[in-house]
Amino acid sequence: NTTTTRPSNRFGGINFAALNKENGCRKAFIPENNKFVEIDISAYHPTLAAHLVGYKFDTDDIHASFAKMYNVDYKKAKELTFKQLYGGVFKQYKDLEFFQKVQKYVDELWEKFNTDGYIECMISKYRFEKDKLDNMNPQKLFNYLLQNLETSLNVRIMKHIIKRIINKKSKLVLYVYDSFLFDLADDEEYLIEDIKNIFKRYKLKVKLKHGTNYDFE
């Protein structure tokens, strides 16, 4: 695991989170069963941040909500939100309600960290302790908390998934941050709907990709 408690996603010397999507190397990974199905969580960190700060989006499509707030296209909105959640709020967007709430939460988190000497994560109860972390700042601390929440929630989700697919031909073969890759047998396609319902239980929106290799062709 990394300092933030997030998995490193390295196995056998390969960083699966950083596999190139353009040069065709993903085609080398093929399923033992009939196909790969990847379930991706949409807007994972904005969803978690909204939960932490008590903000409700006006639509299920969070990136579309941000595009409307910023008055930019969908792709640009995703980029802007990612940069601000990890690097701090841009001056021109600091008056948006979502980022006002985020900033208030970050400030309070930082005050607690300095007063108590630690913060405790809500699901895992893991503590980020001040005397064990170098060069910490408010935004970095918030990022650590987000990544721990993501990892803790994913562990819970995977426990449910494993219970559902145990003794099946289909397997969960890879987990990378916000995506779960399944090696799916043709006669077990019904499992995907069951697995989607697990994410729904946690109010997470997902999208699916499938193919006969990891490039989804």
Roles of regions detected by a PLM:
Residues N1-V72, K125-I162, K171-L181, A185, ...:
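Acidic, glycine-rich two-metal-ion catalytic cores of nucleic acid-processing enzymes
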Residues H45, F90-K91, E188-E189:
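Internal amphipathic alpha-helical segments of the cytochrome P450 catalytic fold
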Residues K68-Y175, Y202-V206, H210-T212, F216-E217:
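Conserved catalytic core of nucleic-acid polymerases
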